[in-house]
Amino acid sequence: MIYHKYSHSEHIIDRFLEGYGWENGHHRPEMDVVSLYVEQVGENDLSRERAERHPGMKIYPTIAEALTEGGSDLSVDAVLLIGEHGSYPHNEKGQHLYPRYEYFQQVVDVYRRSGRAAPLFNDKHLSWNWDYAKEMVDTSRAMNFGLMAGSSLPVTWRQPSIDLPLGAPVKEAVAVWGGGIDGGDIHVIEAMQSIVERRRGGETGIVAVEAFRGDRFWKAMAAGSWDAGGWDPVLLESCLSRSNQLKSPRPTYSHVLPTTDDLKRMAGDSYAYRFEYADGLKATIVQFQAAAGQTDGGVVGDCSMAARLHDGDL
């Protein structure tokens, strides 16, 4: 875990320590953060200041000691695993090799040694490696402890504050964000998933995934429909029009819908994923990512999503 300004640790742990605004008051969770393990401590570290101000929370040099509070057996009621930020390598695919799996194994070692387990929440996706992620799920089931994971976007504010009617017959969905291979993808995927899983019949699973980048992405953009190899352009336009952070392709007071030529100039390294669900739902994630080194690029700064029902309604 890394703990600095605007880090995931600050966003999550500070809310446990300080509380947060909820409805018409300030909510303080009815639980205590009693121990902390921080792997990399830089000049901008906040963990030491937080521990000094909240003496009930102690920092330990290892994950095992944090879980046992310096003793021999598990002594906490729940575990929060945050493997984000810090100095870790990338692989050839651009994935950030965060050690979430390795952290998880150290947690499980304490569970096994103690003869009991506790629920664990893993911030964002389980791992960059599919086999690691599957092993984490299999281990939690074999040891019978709750394992939860995911992005914060499904539970953040929505503008407007709407949702799909429960049981809605959804035909196709598109979600848009500003890129970020691996780390950024999970956010927009989960934001869309939290909405479409309310569809008629509930979640059925995904049977196929297709990724587009480079020339294949722009060909898919021009295809005009899912059946032609792309996605619904009306849904894409709806996403861009709903964005509160749509970057105008030219100086103007109001939003301007970018053309394909604008998008190529502003977001030359864009990519997309198409998901085919077992019940026939088609969904696409479009990531308008600026080219490497492009400081004035980008299209949107927020995440937006649109869906078409079987009767044609958006």
Regions from the PLM with identified roles:
Residues 105, 115-196:
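A contiguous active-site-proximal alpha/beta segment in oxidoreductase catalytic domains
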Residues 291-314:
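C-terminal helical cap and adjacent loop that interface with cofactors, partners, or active-site loops
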Residues 173-176, 273-277, 298, 304-305:
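Short, hydrophobic/proline-enriched secondary-structure or compact coil segments at domain edges
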Residues 30, 167, 269, 299-301:
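A short, structural micro-pattern
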Residues 184, 284-285:
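Short helix/loop capping segments that flank catalytic or ligand/cofactor-binding pockets
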Residues 1-119, 135, 141-142, 199-208, ...:
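N-terminal glycine-/serine-/threonine-rich beta1-alpha1-beta2 phosphate-ribose binding loop
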Residues 281-282, 313:
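Short, solvent-exposed loop/turn motifs
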Residues 8-10, 187, 314:
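Histidine-centered active-site/metal-ligand motif
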